[in-house]
Amino acid sequence: MTAGPTAATRPRNRRQLIVEAAGRVFSERGYHAASMEKIAADVGITAAALYRHFPNKYALFAECADVMADGLVAALDEVPPGAPLTDVLTAVTRVTVAHRASGGVYRWEARYLNGEDRRRLRAKFGHVVGRVDEAVQREYALPDERLRAVAALGVIGSITMHHTSIAQRRAEDLLSASALRVAATDPAAARRDARPVELPAQPVPRTRRAEILAAAIPLFARDGFASVTNGQIAEAVGLAPSALYRHYPGKVDILAAACLQAAALLAQGVDQSLHEVAGPHDAVVALAATYVAYSFEHTALNSVAEAELAGLPADLRRSLVVAQREHIAVWEQQLRLARPELDPRQARVLVHAGFGVVVEAGRGLRWRDSHGNRDAVTALVLGALGL
């Protein structure tokens, strides 16, 4: 006698599976572009079944935003007070690497949380920063321990912002060592003989199209692309919303133009910085100083390009992804020449770690632009890279 079909058994950890899948989708696509249908499909259930666990997309998003923060707090609670900095950084690194696919949610997308949820998340990360800060101060009695702590966390968090294939244990070891070097770096000991970085200026808007772009960039940076309306952009340049379409087919084309401008300015700055460098070590120093200068000088433009790139349609995103890869390839090549013991994947992970330092240290300094701040952050980037 043949047994009839067996009904599928619902896994007991269905809610956890949903949160994990949602974290990946939110991290890859952004909050507004993510759909409950896509999340449900990734879990292998219907959207209707998904709504039995979460009443709406925001509720699911808010839980995703909490997952890694809760994991970090729990991991650090298991590290005894007064433990070596290595133990603290290792605990943070293990949780972050384990949540690599979904960890990008907190860096850019957390701005879409409501005020109460954002304050709660900020308090959790504040606890993490406090534990790292305490250990950094205890182990390396140097200036700017808070800056060094957030920069070290920037190294670790960088793994959530790219897709370089690397074994989990190798990633943990590489990031922990890099973060430890950052914590031990004296930002005040930055090279005083380094020549100032001169970047190409952002183009002066001389046409209505350029004026629209210049007005849209700070709005996108402040509120997020999805939250900014055509009406807001039009009002900023004294136009009726319908008049925007004479210059751009749609709002997404304004975003694409902003991202292209960011890529062009960075590429020009890199070309200038590498002119007449003496060798690979000096080349990496020049690259670091240039990227830091670019990030401080073009903060709004850079944040838009970093946060919103994934939301562009594939046809508009393609050339930008190529430019991004070419930029990283320059860093990787020069870093491997300066540190021949690194393989390509290790070098690439460290390059992204350097970018993570700039993001978190810049935020910690509230992007106050000065020669001192630029020099300090550049020193921390070089520490992350092992130079």
Where are these regions (language model features)?
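Helix-turn-helix
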Residues: L17, A21, V25-A59, D223-D253, ...
